[in-house]
Amino acid sequence: MKAWPKVPLGELLRRSDETAVLDPESEYHEVTIKLWGKGVVSRGKVCGNDVVSVRRVVRANQLILSKIDARNGAIGLVPPELDGAIVSNDFPSFDFRAPDECSVAFIGWLVRSSPFVELCKAASEGTTNRVRIKEERFLDQQIALPPLAEQQAIVARLDALAEKTRQVEAHLDAVERDAEHLLALRFRDAVADAPLRPMAEVAPLVRREQSIDLEGRYPELGIRSFGKGTFHKPPLSGSEVGTKRLYRIEPGDLLFSNVFAWEGAIAIAKPEDAGRFGSHRFITCHANTELTTAEFLRYYFLTDEGLLKIGDASPGGAGRNRTLGLDKLMAIEVPMPSLAVQQTFDRLQAEIAALKAKHTAIREANAALLPATLERVFAGSQ
């Protein structure tokens, strides 16, 4: 970065104090600001009659920040769709004094950079959990401001980069949608006219109860909802386990959370899950390898039809009141094409899983590209 002249923010910004005059019968967007430069968004609409404290109006292209979280990157430009939205005094907004000298879009990019977040930290003070930005100190902070033509060139470059990263994400999303659609079609073909067999026959319940040593440690396993797999919980000491029963989990087990299976808390234990334990809330099934595979069953139970059957076997209200019954699970009939057909489908599942793993790495690199570029462009901007 060239040695751009430094300018106090107070020379570029002017506090906006447009008081909101609310119609009791009208609805108004309220504003919130995501952390780490992720944008200014609506937190929902509120009826004017329900607003009991003073509110201010914000306008498109104003700079707005959170007094509490500006030091965590909660700062940005008000988007056009939130013109006329309302905020509390915890969200000061600022007009630009001279847009023909200071590009609004340039500042919009600058405030998303880590150097600017450091500037906000320097303008904040207070004790733990009460740290807030001080507006006067904020406006006294200086930024390096290039000539307008250079500002516009930087904005064009960053806009182009942002669009490219968006296109990469959109392409990966489209490829994965196509892959999931292909998988669904292949599964439909695989189970067409397949006989139904009960879970008790194809993947019976297995319980490996663990004896508890008070001096021992027992790492637990968790299951994410919506088919998101397993995760590791911190280990429990024997004394923490107390009288609770723990059951050993082995790789390849088909796992159900008895309280959240109805929302897709169904997974297969991975090799890295070996040596972990589940409570009585875990239902562990072992696929009969002469008839089926855990991967095929998992896919089925995460389809609309499979989840409907799990829901029917989980009576009760919402949340933890919906408990999957063991006998009801074992009675569920699942489609059983030939083992060869299931294995062919599983190979396709594995190929798509590998594709998604590659995409994850690409997404991570893509997500890091813009922040790294902002860091490079605005290094020394304070």
Give short role names for the model-derived ranges.
Residues M1-A20, D140-A156, A160-Q210, A331, ...:
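Non-catalytic DNA-recognition/assembly elements of restriction-modification systems
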Residues V7-V21, V31-A60, A200-S211, G216-P251:
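Sequence-specific dsDNA recognition surfaces
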Residues S26-E27, V78, G216-R217, A269:
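Short Gly/aromatic-enriched secondary-structure transition segments
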Residues C47, V52-S53, E81, T128, ...:
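A structural connector/turn signal
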Residues R55-R56, A60-F116, P251, L255-G306, ...:
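A short beta-sheet element
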Residues R71, A85-P92, E125-A149, R276-F282, ...:
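A short glycine-rich beta-alpha junction/loop motif
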Residues D312:
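Disulfide-stabilized, aromatic/cysteine-rich ligand-recognition loop
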